[in-house]
Design a protein with these regions (language model features):
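Predominantly soluble domains enriched in secretory-pathway, periplasmic, or organellar proteins
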Residues: 1-208
Length: 208
């Protein structure tokens, strides 16, 4: 839970809490390994991924990732994990056998873009070779060939509706939930296909 920065373990037979484990920061989501007795927890407020051994009932590893990690996607063989880092336009690729980041994917529209893509959802293709990344504030999906983790390559972008918040793969179809509607709004300055690579803009405001 985010409210008290803890992982709760619930006994489904007795419908009671069997353990509470501090995360050291706000948790976002968790996912079970398909092959190991491990649970992976993205620590939203800590810039880290925690590894919880479900047999030993304790955290066994902490893996440093990017800023504001949220959604998690694990390969079917349980060897690799992808975590979306909302605050710095990146996805951390983690080798779950070595428990370390082996690659960082940049999902911004331009190589030198300022932070602000706001990644918030991941989905792997059925063949496990393509990763789809929801860039909420870019109104797009970023696509990466991840067939060989550690040597991934960008495949480009797919335009979406306004503020994509979730992406899922069903067969050969990509389903995207648009949090604010169907039109790609509300950036008055773009996206602009003619903008030069690396050109960025910002707006000032007065909060007083």
């Amino acid at each position: 839970t985010k409210e008290n920065n803890s992982l709760y373990v619930v006994d489904l037979k007795t419908k009671s809490i069997s353990g509470v484990y501090p995360l050291g920061g706000e948790g976002y989501t968790c996912a079970l390994s398909p092959t190991k007795p491990e649970l992976y927890v993205s620590c939203w407020g800590g810039g880290k991924l925690l590894v919880f051994n479900t047999m030993q009932k304790q955290f066994t590893d902490t893996i440093k990732v990017g800023s504001h990690p949220n959604d998690i996607e694990i390969t079917a063989n349980g060897n690799f994990l992808f975590v979306a880092n909302a605050n710095d336009n990146t996805v951390s690729v983690i080798d779950l056998n070595k428990k370390r980041v082996i690659e960082i994917l940049n999902t911004a529209l331009y190589r030198n873009s300022l932070y602000g893509s706001t990644l918030n959802s991941l989905a792997l293709s059925t063949d496990q070779k393509t990763l789809y990344i929801a860039n909420a504030d870019n109104n797009s999906l970023s696509i990466y060939d991840v067939g060989k983790p550690g040597f991934s390559s960008s495949e480009g972008f797919i335009p979406t509706g306004w503020y994509p918040t979730s992406v899922a793969i069903v067969g050969n179809k990509i389903l995207v939930a648009n949090g604010k509607g169907f039109s790609s709004l509300a950036n008055p300055y773009g996206p602009n296909p003619a903008r030069k690579d690396g050109e960025s803009i910002y707006q000032k405001s007065d909060t007083t």
